[in-house]
Amino acid sequence: MSLVLEVKTKNYLDDLLSIKKSLSHMETIVEEYNGYVLSESELKFGWTFFKLAFKPNLQNGIKEKFSDMLNKYPSSDQSQKFAKFMIDYFQSRGCAAIIKAND
């Protein structure tokens, strides 16, 4: 099953660009392209919300390439480990959006 992250931001254009650049970099590292889908954005109360869904090819490529790092996350749930890894990755690349795993 593909992971879906929920994203909320007050600076949609900057954070969207940051996420797209980060994902492009990740796709290059794992050599899997067109590996994600972004939903339409929705504006509520000054926040912009959208979802980021990973396609299996990119998700599996990341899991294989970064398995040692993913295993360091304390959760026994593999999808939660992957979500936390990606959230940390986006933050390390300068993304200021609030990101959480879709429950």
Regions found by a protein language model. Name each.
Residues 4-8, 51-53, 98-100:
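Ser/Thr- (and often Asn-) enriched beta-sheet segments in non-cytosolic proteins
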Residues 1-23:
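Short, extreme N-terminal segment that most often corresponds to the first beta-strand
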Residues 84-103:
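Mixed-charge, Lys/Arg-enriched low-complexity segments
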Residues 31-76:
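Short, intrinsically disordered low-complexity segments
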Residues 1-4, 45-49, 92:
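A general secondary-structure signal for short beta-strands and their flanking turns/coil
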Residues 17-25, 60-85, 95:
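Extended Gly/Ser/Thr-rich low-complexity repeat segments
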Residues 27-36, 90-95:
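Short secondary-structure junctions
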